[in-house]
Amino acid sequence: MTEDPSASTGRQFHELSRVPVDPDAGVVYEFGWQSWSPSTAYPVSAGGGFRPTRPELQTSYYRREKPAPAAAFQGEGLLAIEPAPGEPVHVVALRDGRAEVPTIRAERRSDTLHVAADGAVDQVVDDGPGGLYGALARFADRYIAAVGTPTLRDVPPMWASWYQYFTGFTEDDLIRNLDAMDALDLPVGIVRLDDAFQAGIGDWLAPSEGFSSLDGMIGRVLDRGRRAGIWTAPLLVGAESRTFAEHPDWLVRDAAGRPIVAQHNWNQDCYVLDATHPAAADYLREVFTTYRRYGATYFMVDFMYAGAIEGVRHADVDGITAYRDALRLIRSCIGDDALLQACGAPMFPSVGLVDTMRVGTDVAPHWFPPGGEMSSPATRAAVVSTVGRAFTQGRFWINDPDCLVARPQIEGRERWAEVVDRYGGVRISSDGLDQLDDWGLETTHRLLVPARTAPFDPSRVPLDTSLFQDTPPTVEHSAGAPR
């Protein structure tokens, strides 16, 4: 058993440089730890970026071990400074996120930013075209040249159950939407069966009351000539699950021996599965080989940040190693020909191991995040990080901006559709298809195309700051009633 690294005070920061800036016009870009961590550029005058609005969110949405100071900028593995418009961009970045992801900070003192890191990083002054986002794209090119260029697979357009039905999704809902796909001639290549089919968080091979059987559920999709995809949160174990009751030894623990809570969700505490435990690893193998045997060829693994939380594991490994080993285990079960999508996942440690990656928060029927928490589900929050991480598209993986939601009840649906179109890679519809009006159906038809694989070019698709505006969009009611 390894000692709990999270109990330590962490590595010391060392100063790298001092960058003169225009306090009124300079900007600093922060790259967040995982999918839902805010990633965008801020005015130097802000003094720092978005931070957790409640302490427990440090674990579930940010980086548990590395809380950011209120009066400094902080990037996980990547931070960039544009001292003034048109000036060369200072890109401070890690060397290899497969082993460690240093934290980088920039503290403003008058008209200078003091830059420091707690690990090995390089600082490049980029005077190329495209400003800040051009410099970030060139960093991403250098990074994959050093660690290996991922293979980008073809990803067809999809439909997912989540944003219409959430945990209330049933087999009847599935059948109704499969019928609608045929009737509306929607080019859905993969149907993703999202959170709702399973008996519990951690009980992945037992169906919920809404489904007769898991193999039958997947079979219904295959019988329509479409591919089946399935959602799991494989590194979470819910306190109410049978897995938790029967296998408490499968959990990652703190130095005092208490199981680490990764998140409170589904009305229960959710703990971290220790995938280095031989029996827990065997369980993961059983889950994913079973789904593959049933016919699933697309796998969305969610809440994956849990697997990289530092703690006491069966094997003497750090969190990043444990996380990457868990992804490799899953890949070995589903095969190289299957599609693997990560969400809520550590960014740099995932490069080269996943096909598609969520790059922002969840969208939602509402525009503004509750309580101003920019890592929580809200469409404005999703816009900010989807645009802020657009440079990773076609370089680290294929970007998932999150699903297109186009029914009339969605605040800002037209603005969100524009973001998906301009900055996204993967295309996924997630409305009840009988809830779409004329605008929603036309938009869904137009945007449901195969995923882009080309690298995002910030010179061709410049940042549109109007997408961030703080005036709440109206709920549009286009001509035509829901079908």
Task: Mark where each language-model region is.
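N-terminal accessory beta-strand-rich subdomains and adjacent acidic, glycine-rich linkers
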Residues: 1-137
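N-terminal carbohydrate-binding accessory modules
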Residues: 132-150
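Aromatic-lined carbohydrate-binding/catalytic grooves of carbohydrate-active enzymes
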Residues: 155-159, 164-289, 298-301, 306-315
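Carbohydrate-binding surfaces of carbohydrate-active enzymes
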Residues: 174, 180, 184-185, 207, ...
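Amphipathic alpha-helical segments in well-structured domains
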Residues: 214, 319-327
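Glycan-recognition surfaces
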Residues: 244-278, 282, 325-436
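Glycine-enriched alpha-helix->loop->beta-strand junction motifs that scaffold or abut catalytic
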Residues: 295-297, 359
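Short glycine/threonine-rich loop-to-helix capping motif typified by GTGT followed
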Residues: 311-320, 353-356
